[in-house]
């Protein structure tokens, strides 16, 4: 078994019973793959597939001019490399993007050429087509300096859908069937039955029309329409009555209206008897071909074809006419013998199309098309060309209508065709096939579709959404180019004169900047990032709206299994509309979600893994992942629990075709991080998975002692840790960078064999939490590719660590944990367990105003030196300064308009030369309620503006850092080269060299060490080949130095050129403040099982309940929070955490008494290999075992995977191992060792009963009381009512509302009430008066008229009612 560098240091003991057959796929794959297919940047132009940008270009080009003599063709496109890297874009507020250039060809044809067109001229040119934002390696985009995520959209797949209204439309409760053809782009086509069973169609939800109008419009005659939808009965007219062709199936179940006889005249069915199977057999036995029917049997039947008089050519009766006595007489007159009628019955062959034809008043194709034109364009005159153009554009034009590959596949599958490809527009037979299926549904054959089935909903990913926007931009460009192409020849234009890239840029910018699906990335912790990128939303353009979405769409559907998580979804109005991809889910080429299954052949489970979509899955019998399997892979049980088409049943093993890959297959990343999820109620699990995303990264992350084994995958895939790109040896490491000398076999020839990782230090995330990376390797460590080198935010030794492991006791404590409150020990705060660092970014810009430029300076009048004390000579705060609310961070003055001066002032000015009052102080100050330490300052200066000292110093520091990286690389490169050189030179014969090396001397190591390395190149060797080698090495070193110098120059140029700033901005300064937040009452905390609460009190450690060995509890929770919420998982987690810590203490005690390594090995083997998944401890050296044991002192980490976790029996085994009888007795534990006798910290008395105690991974959430509370005495007031504003952002007051007024009224506190409603609210004069009185020390209140009363009076007057106040 292979362990990575970090896994060896701390192995997580897994209780999984099942072996891993399929690794969890890369969690960000959907985003990254989708965008790379959109760009196809690393594919040669000739080999690009028709998708993404390539598809957009080929769909719009070639563009042909109106006269047809000029056309613009698309050749290929290329993307340039971005000007700034990701970090620079974030600092400067730029978009991380790449310029798109398309090579286009302008072809001009000769107008004079008499026959076929001749090419006169071809011009080819690269044209700039706008900027395309690039995806970062972690699946996000940097737009205007902030990281954003494009969320995937779950929408209705294009294709054809059949449904009914569930009897809701008509009062009778009759089911009205309908069908809808949805294209990817273009007009929707609906077909629907009305309560009278007439079939209508409508285009784009406009007015409905009989469907036969559409059939006529596509060129069918009434006869053809009837022939398509009905079978015919053939009659031969006799002198009396008629003969009807005998078709057995059509008679079964009918009631005979007359005696039915065979050829001899023997009665087989008597009149008024129902015809049954025996009668039919008798008729068939009698070889009946025709049945004689009386005349009235024909009446009321409908003719299937036009009946024409053979002699005169006159139409006697039209198709779809009813046969009456008059019609029969006419037919006999014209001596017509054979007629065909429509066969209909009430059961399974309704006359729907026939009745629709009767309603339809149009005569022929033209009339039908005109009717459609009038419905689409009411009020416009229908000219022949316009009618034709509109009809063709509706469904037959490739520009306006696109079914897409998916739509065509879904359509063909639904109408029962074998091939899944075909034209992308609608065809006549598509419309016919749809109507046929709809009529069959009405006839009672077939099933309607389930729109919530994941086979009918598909996912649109980033790539596809961006492509649609890009195409929309290109189509706008196409219109403009068409206009100008006519002048291309006469004005001798080049392609770049024709194409204006603005529409494309604006479409792309609008999509990435303000689309509903482009969201500000949730970056609170690594899990929230990864979940945000795996989110699937049903909202957004072309999707549902919150208000209109019903219960069915939001509900969990059987097809969600393994594709979409049934647990993780927001609470509130979006519930069920926003989902998360399941752990193993994957998109197929059509955008449908697939999930992996293991193939089962003859009741034997194989290792073959197939990805099945929701539709394919419905055809198979699938066993669950926990089905018992023997060693050879056979299914053991007689009956196996399995699913088929969404139904669960027990079947015999021979019927099983597939089996789940893993028990955690059905849940998302967040839900799979909850241990004992199977013991939690679903509602609480939902809260648990949502709250893990809000956990604030702690200062010292701590791995959860009870995890699920997926923590490592999440940490690595989120990109928050640093992974080794290539294996090698750690050459240098400090807090900010790691240098690795790459293994020879992994280094590419001619490339630097050095990897340098600059770590992210104290950087602000989107949510103002702190992102900081810490190295976990030492110099000299050997690392392999993919090993974790540094931990990021919320990771510990390469595992996700969202909170801290707390010693928890479940017991009430003086009412301080009433209603989910949390009681916490002061020790937790003192040890900084939940202390987090938050980084605030404060900006100030100096603009060019009408009155002159604003200036960033230290020279500000009317400010005491104390206030300027933290600023440097440029007026910018020092790094490391500790600042509080109101302190100046950046000094800035703004010119103020010239005021009219009195002659006296003018004189004073002239004497003292005072200019100070021309400017006002607009410095950047620390906002109220904030204090912290300045950790970074960035200064950006516009091109052509003089840089101040501070800006120059920042650039110099950055260059120094970069030079350090280059020197490290050079040092290692040269070191390697000189080592190779020494091996080559030793033992060679020299012709001469430095330090008077004699000719013919053999070079030895001592001689080389005595020389400076660079002088080695001066040695003249006798062997020509060796001399050539020496020269080659010298050249390669010089080449490398030259390359590094160039790179340094490039960097310097980039840093010293002016910055791109918004118009009118001369200088911008960003100051970053680090704010330390300790845990305090009012902060929200939660476990992973939806058990949330608010800290109510922080209790001195000496008052907390403690155990017999003096160890106090960290957190006291209310036991009443468990039974009604049904999240029992937290109790099991506490028990297992107790065992984990107990084992850790035992290992610590063994290390303390310096046990033999062998004894350690035995104990560790007992822990790891007695149950659950076995670990290969044999392969560990003694040193590695020792390091492992040292890392386990704080607790042996356990993994209890979702739905495959630790059993009760395994947990008691671990508790027995952790707490042998002597320890258990000392702590006065119960027999099952999960409850302990606790003592009251205040009295020292033992509590009456033993208490459940153990360790739980507890999180501090991003709802911090510091961000929510604020205080105000005076501040801004509303303009109209003069009442204080509300809310923290406005620095507002607390609303004293209607009910609070009632409370004071009820209490009779009249003065308090008067004060509340006047001087403390909106009595303007009263407010100032109170302030004045307070200053004078005279505590009197004069309440006046509240301003809002005046507003009321004015409003009443505006209604025309005169209202006046009598003042006495």
Swiss-Prot record:
For this protein, the record's SUPFAM superfamilies field holds: beta and beta-prime subunits of DNA dependent RNA-polymerase
Asked whether the UniProt record includes Kinase among its keywords, one would answer: no
An annotated Gene Ontology molecular function: DNA-directed RNA polymerase activity
Which spans are transmembrane here? none
Catalysed reaction(s) here are: RNA(n) + a ribonucleoside 5'-triphosphate = RNA(n+1) + diphosphate
* EC number of this enzyme: 2.7.7.6
| Signal sequence extent | none
Query: What's a GO cellular component annotated to this UniProt protein?
Result: DNA-directed RNA polymerase complex
GO biological process terms held by the UniProt record: DNA-templated transcription
Keyword annotations for this protein, in alphabetical order, are: DNA-directed RNA polymerase, Nucleotidyltransferase, Transcription, Transferase
Q: What does this protein do?
A: DNA-dependent RNA polymerase catalyzes the transcription of DNA into RNA using the four ribonucleoside triphosphates as substrates.
Instruction: Family membership, please give it.
Output: Belongs to the RNA polymerase beta chain family.
Its quaternary structure? The RNAP catalytic core consists of 2 alpha, 1 beta, 1 beta' and 1 omega subunit. When a sigma factor is associated with the core the holoenzyme is formed, which can initiate transcription.
HAMAP family named among the record's database cross-references:
RNApol_bact_RpoB
Protein name per the record: DNA-directed RNA polymerase subunit beta
């Amino acid at each position: 078994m292979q362990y990575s560098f970090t896994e060896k240091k701390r192995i997580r003991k897994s209780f999984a019973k099942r072996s891993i057959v399929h690794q969890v796929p890369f969690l960000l794959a959907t985003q990254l793959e989708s965008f790379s297919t959109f760009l196809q940047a690393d594919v040669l132009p000739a080999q690009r597939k028709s998708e993404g940008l390539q598809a957009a270009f080929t769909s719009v080009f070639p563009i042909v001019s109106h006269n047809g003599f000029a056309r613009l063709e698309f050749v290929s496109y290329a993307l340039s490399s971005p000007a700034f890297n990701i970090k620079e874009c974030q600092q400067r507020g730029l978009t991380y993007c790449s310029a798109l250039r398309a090579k286009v060809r302008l072809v001009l044809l000769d107008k004079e050429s008499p026959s076929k067109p001749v090419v006169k001229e071809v011009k080819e040119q690269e044209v700039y087509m706008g900027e395309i934002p690039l995806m970062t390696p972690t699946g996000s985009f940097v737009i205007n300096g902030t990281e954003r995520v494009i969320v995937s959209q779950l929408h209705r797949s294009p294709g054809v859908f059949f449904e009914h209204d569930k009897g809701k439309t008509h009062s009778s409760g009759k089911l009205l069937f309908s069908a809808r053809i949805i294209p990817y782009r273009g007009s929707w086509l609906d077909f629907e039955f009305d309560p009278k069973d007439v079939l209508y169609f409508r285009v784009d939800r406009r007015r409905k029309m009989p469907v036969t109008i559409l059939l006529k419009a596509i060129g069918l005659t009434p006869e053809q329409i009837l022939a398509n939808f009905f079978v015919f009965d053939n009659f031969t007219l006799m002198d009396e009555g008629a003969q009807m062709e005998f078709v057995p199936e059509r008679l079964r179940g009918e009631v005979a209206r007359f005696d039915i006889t065979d050829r001899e005249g023997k009665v087989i069915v008597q009149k008024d008897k129902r015809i049954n199977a025996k009668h039919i057999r008798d008729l068939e036995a009698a070889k009946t071909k025709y049945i004689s029917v009386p005349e009235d049997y024909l009446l009321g039947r409908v003719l299937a074809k036009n009946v024409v008089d053979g002699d005169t050519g006159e139409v006697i009766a039209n198709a779809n006419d009813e046969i009456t006595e008059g019609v029969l007489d006419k037919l006999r007159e014209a001596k017509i013998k054979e007629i065909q009628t429509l066969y209909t019955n009430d059961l399974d062959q309704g006359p729907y199309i026939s009745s629709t034809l009767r309603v339809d008043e149009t005569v022929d194709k033209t009339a039908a098309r005109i009717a459609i034109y009038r419905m689409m364009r009411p009020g416009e005159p229908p000219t022949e060309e316009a009618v034709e153009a509109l009809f063709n554009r509706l469904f037959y034009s490739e520009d306006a209508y696109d079914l897409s590959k998916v739509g065509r596949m879904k359509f063909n599958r639904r109408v029962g065709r074998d091939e899944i490809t075909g034209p992308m527009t609608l065809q006549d037979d598509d419309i016919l096939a749809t109507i046929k299926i709809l009529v069959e549904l009405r006839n009672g054959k077939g099933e309607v579709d389930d729109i919530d089935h994941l086979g009918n909903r598909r996912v649109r990913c980033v790539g596809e959404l961006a492509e649609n926007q890009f195409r929309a931009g290109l189509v706008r460009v196409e219109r403009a180019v068409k206009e100008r192409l006519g002048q291309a020849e006469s004005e001798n234009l080049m392609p770049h004169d024709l194409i204006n890239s603005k529409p494309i840029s604006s479409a792309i910018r609008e999509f990435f900047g303000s689309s509903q699906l482009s969201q500000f990335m949730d970056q609170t912790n690594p899990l929230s990032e990864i979940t945000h990128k795996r989110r699937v939303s049903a909202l957004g353009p072309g999707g549902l709206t919150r208000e209109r979405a019903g219960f069915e769409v939001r509900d969990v559907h059987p097809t969600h299994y393994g594709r979409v998580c049934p647990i993780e979804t927001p609470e509130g109005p979006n519930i069920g509309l926003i989902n998360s991809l399941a752990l193993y889910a994957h998109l197929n080429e059509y955008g449908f979600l697939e999930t992996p299954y293991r193939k089962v052949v003859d009741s034997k489970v194989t290792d073959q893994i197939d990805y099945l979509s929701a539709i394919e899955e419905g055809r198979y019998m699938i066993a669950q992942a926990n089905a018992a399997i023997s060693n050879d892979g056979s299914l053991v049980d007689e009956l196996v629990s399995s699913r088929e088409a969404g139904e669960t049943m027990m079947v015999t093993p021979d019927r099983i075709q597939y089996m789940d890959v893993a028990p955690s297959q059905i849940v998302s990343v967040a839900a799979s991080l909850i241990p004992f999820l199977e013991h939690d109620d679903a509602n609480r699990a939902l809260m648990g998975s949502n709250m893990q995303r809000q956990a604030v990264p702690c200062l010292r992350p701590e791995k959860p002692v009870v995890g699920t084994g997926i923590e490592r995958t999440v940490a690595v895939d989120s990109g928050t840790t640093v992974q080794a790109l290539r294996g090698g040896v750690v050459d240098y490491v400090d807090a900010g960078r790691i240098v690795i000398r790459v293994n020879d076999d992994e280094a590419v020839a001619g490339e630097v064999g050095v990897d340098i990782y600059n770590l992210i230090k104290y950087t602000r995330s989107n949510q103002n939490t702190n992102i900081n990376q810490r190295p976990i390797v030492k110099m000299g460590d050997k690392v392999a590719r993919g090993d974790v080198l540094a931990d990021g935010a919320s990771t510990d030794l390469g595992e996700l660590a969202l909170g801290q492991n707390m010693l928890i006791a479940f017991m009430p404590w003086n009412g301080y944990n009433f209603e989910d409150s949390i009681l916490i020990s002061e020790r937790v705060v003192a040890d900084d367990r939940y202390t987090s660092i938050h980084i605030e970014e404060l900006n100030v810009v100096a603009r060019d105003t009408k009155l002159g430029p604003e200036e960033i300076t230290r020279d500000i009048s009317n400010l005491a030196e104390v206030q300027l004390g933290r600023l440097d000579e440029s007026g910018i705060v020092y790094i490391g300064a500790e600042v509080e609310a109101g302190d100046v961070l950046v000094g800035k003055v703004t010119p103020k308009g010239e005021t009219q001066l009195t002659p006296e002032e003018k004189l004073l000015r002239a004497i003292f030369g005072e200019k100070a009052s021309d400017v006002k102080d607009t410095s950047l100050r620390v906002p109220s309620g904030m204090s912290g330490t300045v950790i970074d300052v960035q200064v950006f200066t516009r091109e052509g503006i003089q840089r101040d000292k501070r800006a120059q110093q920042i650039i110099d520091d950055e260059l120094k850092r970069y030079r350090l990286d280059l020197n490290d690389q050079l040092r290692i490169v040269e070191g390697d080269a000189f080592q190779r050189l020494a091996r080559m030179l030793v033992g060679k014969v020299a012709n001469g060299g430095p330090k008077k090396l004699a000719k013919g001397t053999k070079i030895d190591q001592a001689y080389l060490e005595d020389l400076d390395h660079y002088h080695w190149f001066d040695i003249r060797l006798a062997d020509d080949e060796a001399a050539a080698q020496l020269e080659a090495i010298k050249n390669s070193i010089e080449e490398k130095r030259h390359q590094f110098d160039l790179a340094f120059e490039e960097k310097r140029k980039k840093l010293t050129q002016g910055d791109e700033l918004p118009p009118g901005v001369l200088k911008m300064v960003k100051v970053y403040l680090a704010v330390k937040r300790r845990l305090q009452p009012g902060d929200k905390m939660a476990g992973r099982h939806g058990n949330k609460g608010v800290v109510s009190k922080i209790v001195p450690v000496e008052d907390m309940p403690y155990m017999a060995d003096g160890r106090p509890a960290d957190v006291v929770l209310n036991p009443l929070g468990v039974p009604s919420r049904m999240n029992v998982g937290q109790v099991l987690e506490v028990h297992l955490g107790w065992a984990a810590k107990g084992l850790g203490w035992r290992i610590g005690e063994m290390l303390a008494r310096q046990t033999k390594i062998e004894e350690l090995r035995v104990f560790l083997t007992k822990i790891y290999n007695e149950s659950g998944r076995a670990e290969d401890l044999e392969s560990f050296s003694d040193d590695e075992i020792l390091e492992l044991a040292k890392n386990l002192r704080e607790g042996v980490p356990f993994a209890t995977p979702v739905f495959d976790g630790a059993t009760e029996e395994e947990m008691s085994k671990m508790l027995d191992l952790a707490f042998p009888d002597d320890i258990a007795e000392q702590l006065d534990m119960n027999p099952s060792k999960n409850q302990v006798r606790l003592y009251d910290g205040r009295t020292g008395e033992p509590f009456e009963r033993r208490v459940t105690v153990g360790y739980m991974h507890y999180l501090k959430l991003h709802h911090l009381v510091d961000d929510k509370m604020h205080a105000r005495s005076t501040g801004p007031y509303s303009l109209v009512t003069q009442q204080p504003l509300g809310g923290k952002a406005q620095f507002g007051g607390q609303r004293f509302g209607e009910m609070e007024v009632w409370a004071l009224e009820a209490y009779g506190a009249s003065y308090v009430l008067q004060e509340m409603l006047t001087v403390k609210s909106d009595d303007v004069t009263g407010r100032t008066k109170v302030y004045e009185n307070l200053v004078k020390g005279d505590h009197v209140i004069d309440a006046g008229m509240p301003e809002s009363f005046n507003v009321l009076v004015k409003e009443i007057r505006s209604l025309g009612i005169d209202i006046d106040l009598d003042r006495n």
